[in-house]
Amino acid sequence: MKYIVMQDVFFVVLLLVLAVPLGIYMYKVMIGEKVFLSRVLEPVERFGYRLMGVSEVGMSAKRYAVSVLAFSAVGFVFVMAVLMLQGFLPLNPEGMKGLSFSLAFNTAASFVSNTNWQAYSGETALSYFSQSIGLTVQNFVSAATGIAVLFAVIRGFIWKKQKTVGNFWQDLFRVTLYILLPLSLVLALLLVSQGVVQSFADYSVVETLENGAKQLIPLGPAASQIAIKQLGTNGGGFFGANSAFPFENPSSFTNLIEMLAILLIPVALVVMFGRAVKDSKQGRAIMTAMMIVFVIGVVAITISEQFAGPHYQGVATSGSMEGKEVRFGVGGSSLFAASTTAASNGAVNAMHDSLTPLGGLVPMFFMQLGEVIFGGVGSGLYGMIGFIILTVFIAGLLVGRTPEYLGKKIEPYDMKMVCLLILVPPLLTLFGTAVAVMMPSVQASVSASGAHGFSEVLYAFTSMGNNNGSAFAGFAADTTFTNMVGAVMMLLARFIPLVAALYLAQNMAGKSSVAASSGTLSTKNGMFIGLLIGVVVLVGALSFLPALALGPIADFFTTFK
């Protein structure tokens, strides 16, 4: 246990050390200031703008949102076409056939929405072309879209009397060129150096040591996709077993760098936020709130998995190792599970369906908090800003003062947008789960009975409704109902809050700042951090406690039998 504690502390410290300079760098990218890569990348940037016909004219929230939706729609159609027609496309050495309409629809929605829910196994269903040209490209642009929208939201708080929130095409291009591509290149090369596969060769047939039997070894351009899958909080694995597969995550060292990659940009964006609003204490307050909840979750999962459960009381064990890789152990698996669900990533290095009931409850609850404990790149922070405004609003009601945040007064219109930001994911999750448990096809998809069977369904629709993408793998996801309903859920959960965030940003940008007074609520002290955590957890608890009581909580009490 001491080793696990040391590992977790080292991880958090290293994460913060890496995130601070990256956050400062991203702030410079956001405001268009020169960075150390400018000499190399500025000519590429100018050429890209000329090629796409991009002007630097600012956009209103409506125009920005239309640009995001149109761009995403084109990506959706392209990915769906590639998946359905892959049998006729190049780079298909294994002769993979096109996906069914419902599966292609679900997969396209999943990757466009930055969810990366996978109802297929990559090595048996997709060609190299589909993986690299279809899905990997979406991993880049969906992540860049989230960060671009966050840039717009931040401008809403730092600009005064403005009618625009920035230019989507410029933001998208700069995020991709200056942030995601360089980081992904470095990480991909690092992964390849550690043995992660990067090849366009045919699958290999090898003779095993057991009776000379033949075995097919899948290959492919995995490292390049894994790099952006982690950095962009996408999470979709090149192989079916995701980061539990040795070709994706071969050692404890690659496990460390993949976990760092999952949280690096979300944490750095908080640093960037503090820099952008000219008050680092604001960023530190948000970081502290996120980190407190994250650490509590890591501790809860680790203890639950290390001590396995009441039925192992008095038995000497090394923890619950079912569904875990020996090379990672309980500590590496628990930290990964917390990281991937706190950050809206969804990659896994262990089977979450095999976690103990309380161990599985924590990742599920992280998602149900709205993916704001770090959350997805961009979307996590603008979701947390929604919770901050809600917290300020509640505090203002308590003391009878007009609430304000960063010098901008909070008005009824702002609260309407915040409600859309906060309430859409839980409503989609609960409605989807309620409908799903009544469907015979979903009931047949569940591998377990009783409380754990319900947990499998709840986890699946929580994951899709909050753009995470991980799953309790005992749930057979490739059914027409789950594919179609899940796709609609993922798109709505992504784009309704995104559009609401943009309109919130424009309304804030149009206001002038008001000077802080003695009655202004401080949003950077310990009291506010506690209030913020309370509001985030309370909204999650009130929304999901009844469902959790029927699932993982009831499942936990069955272990006393």
Curated annotation (Swiss-Prot):
A Pfam family of the record is: KdpA
Annotated keywords: Cell membrane, Ion transport, Membrane, Potassium, Potassium transport, Transmembrane, Transmembrane helix, Transport
Kindly give the membrane topology term recorded for this protein: Multi-pass membrane protein
Q: Where in the cell is it found?
A: Cell membrane
* UniProt GO MF annotations: P-type potassium transmembrane transporter activity; potassium ion binding
Renumbered to this chain, the signal peptide range is none
Q: Give the transmembrane region(s).
A: 4-24, 65-85, 133-153, 177-197, 253-273, 285-305, 380-400, 417-437, 484-504, 528-548
Where mainly found? membrane
Instruction: Note whether Metal-binding occurs among the keywords.
Output: no
GO CC, any one term: plasma membrane
Tell me the subunit arrangement.
Answer: The system is composed of three essential subunits: KdpA, KdpB and KdpC.
According to its UniProt entry, what is the function of this protein? Part of the high-affinity ATP-driven potassium transport (or Kdp) system, which catalyzes the hydrolysis of ATP coupled with the electrogenic transport of potassium into the cytoplasm. This subunit binds the extracellular potassium ions and delivers the ions to the membrane domain of KdpB through an intramembrane tunnel.
Checking NCBIfam families in the record gives: kdpA
The identity of this protein, by name, is: Potassium-transporting ATPase potassium-binding subunit
Q: Specify the species.
A: Listeria monocytogenes serotype 4a (strain HCC23)
What would be the name of the gene that encodes this protein?
Answer: kdpA
